[in-house]
């Protein structure tokens, strides 16, 4: 017997590496040392930082991956993977430096894997983050035919003096919400159930003219470049930041708010995007469940000094980023630290 007889095709793996090399190299930064194929990837951190603090993050894309596989949409799920990781490390003020991915499947389909990794490389390129390595694991009998799993890992850096940890947050600080591109990569176990039970046709169109499937599969917004620009120009105005992921608005912003303080969020400050309105209507989802499951149109939040909030908003306007003042930091009353109304 051979390894191929057992279900592992080394030649297919080598073909994949050759296919993705030019895509991966487009994401490289000057600090990357060497190319693909080494036992370890190298990144030169010297020269750019005085007191660097490394910030790491790892994530997947949840069961959005299941929907992507059902629809045969493999080219953007990699952008989701990058977004889930780099947006997280950005919260602490870190610039994502490099990224690694893990792709696992029962039988390697080179075309599918190349499409996925192409999306990862594109997400890294858009975030200024180098895709310096990864693992492609072909594991017979571990996954049903046509299915695969994904995970990502990123490392960023921030000057120690510029690290955002929420310590500067004060009562009266303003919450500025930046628009999401859709559900991003959270809440998809509920989304898939609603989609299946609604029986909506593949061509169903939402109130804004977008196809439902396109809205559900829209890749996660990448906030790295615009937010890093804000930190450079208005860093003193930003006291904390939050990436709105699993747990929604209810559970994510509060993670960067010190004890003794709470949040008041004005749900009338922005309009619920059509894809979320459809999900709530078709799934009979209560308001409270919407807030703690989905981002509801707000993908990233800046906690800002009130006197400088207007300047931040002008800077967001200059970058053509949709945004709203969605609330403020208040004194907490009892166990209820987040009020949405």
From Swiss-Prot:
Its EC number is 6.3.3.1. The keyword Nucleotide-binding applies. Keywords: ATP-binding, Cytoplasm, Ligase, Nucleotide-binding, Purine biosynthesis. It is found in: Cytoplasm. SUPFAM superfamilies: PurM C-terminal domain-like, PurM N-terminal domain-like. Its main location: cytoplasm. GO terms for cellular component: cytosol. Disulfide bonds: none annotated. GO terms for molecular function: ATP binding; phosphoribosylamine-glycine ligase activity; phosphoribosylformylglycinamidine cyclo-ligase activity. It catalyses: 2-formamido-N(1)-(5-O-phospho-beta-D-ribosyl)acetamidine + ATP = 5-amino-1-(5-phospho-beta-D-ribosyl)imidazole + ADP + phosphate + H(+). Pathway: Purine metabolism; IMP biosynthesis via de novo pathway; 5-amino-1-(5-phospho-D-ribosyl)imidazole from N(2)-formyl-N(1)-(5-phospho-D-ribosyl)glycinamide: step 2/2. The keyword Cell wall biogenesis/degradation does not apply. InterPro entries: PurM-like_C_dom (IPR010918), PurM-like_C_sf (IPR036676), PurM-like_N (IPR016188), PurM-like_N_sf (IPR036921), PurM_cligase (IPR004733). It is an enzyme of class 6 (ligase). Pfam families: AIRS, AIRS_C. One of its GO terms (biological process) is adenine biosynthetic process. Belongs to the AIR synthase family. NCBIfam families: purM. This is Phosphoribosylformylglycinamidine cyclo-ligase. It comes from Xanthomonas axonopodis pv. citri (strain 306). The gene is purM.
């Amino acid at each position: 017997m051979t390894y191929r007889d057992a279900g592992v095709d080394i030649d297919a793996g080598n073909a994949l590496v050759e296919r993705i090399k030019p895509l991966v190299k487009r994401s490289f930064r000057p600090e990357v040392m060497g190319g693909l194929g080494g036992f370890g990837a190298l990144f030169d951190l010297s020269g750019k930082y005085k007191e660097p603090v490394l910030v790491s993050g790892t994530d997947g894309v949840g069961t959005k991956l299941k929907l992507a596989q059902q629809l045969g949409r493999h080219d953007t799920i990699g952008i989701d993977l990058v977004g889930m990781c780099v947006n997280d490390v950005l919260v602490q003020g870190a610039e994502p430096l490099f990224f690694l991915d893990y792709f696992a499947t029962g039988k390697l389909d080179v075309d599918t894997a190349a499409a996925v990794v192409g999306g990862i490389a594109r997400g890294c390129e858009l975030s200024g983050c180098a895709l310096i390595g990864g693992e492609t694991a072909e594991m017979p009998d571990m996954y049903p035919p046509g299915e695969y799993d994904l995970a990502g890992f990123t490392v960023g850096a921030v000057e120690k003096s510029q690290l955002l940890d929420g310590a500067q947050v004060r009562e009266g600080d303003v919450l500025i919400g930046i628009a999401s591109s859709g559900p991003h990569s959270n809440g998809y176990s509920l989304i898939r159930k609603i989609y299946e039970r609604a029986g909506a046709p593949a061509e169903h169109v939402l109130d804004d003219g977008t196809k439902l499937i396109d809205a559900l599969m829209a890749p996660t917004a990448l906030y790295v470049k615009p937010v890093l620009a804000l930190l450079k120009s208005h860093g003193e105005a930003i006291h904390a930041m939050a990436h709105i992921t699993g747990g929604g608005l209810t559970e994510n912003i509060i993670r960067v708010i010190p004890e003794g303080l709470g949040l008041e969020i004005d749900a009338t400050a922005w309009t619920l995007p059509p894809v979320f309105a459809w999900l709530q209507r078709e799934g009979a989802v209560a308001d409270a469940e919407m807030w703690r499951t989905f981002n509801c149109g707000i993908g990233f939040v800046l906690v800002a000094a009130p006197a400088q909030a207007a300047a931040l908003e002008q800077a967001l306007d200059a970058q053509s980023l949709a945004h709203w003042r969605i609330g403020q930091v208040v004194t907490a009353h009892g166990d209820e630290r987040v009020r949405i109304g």
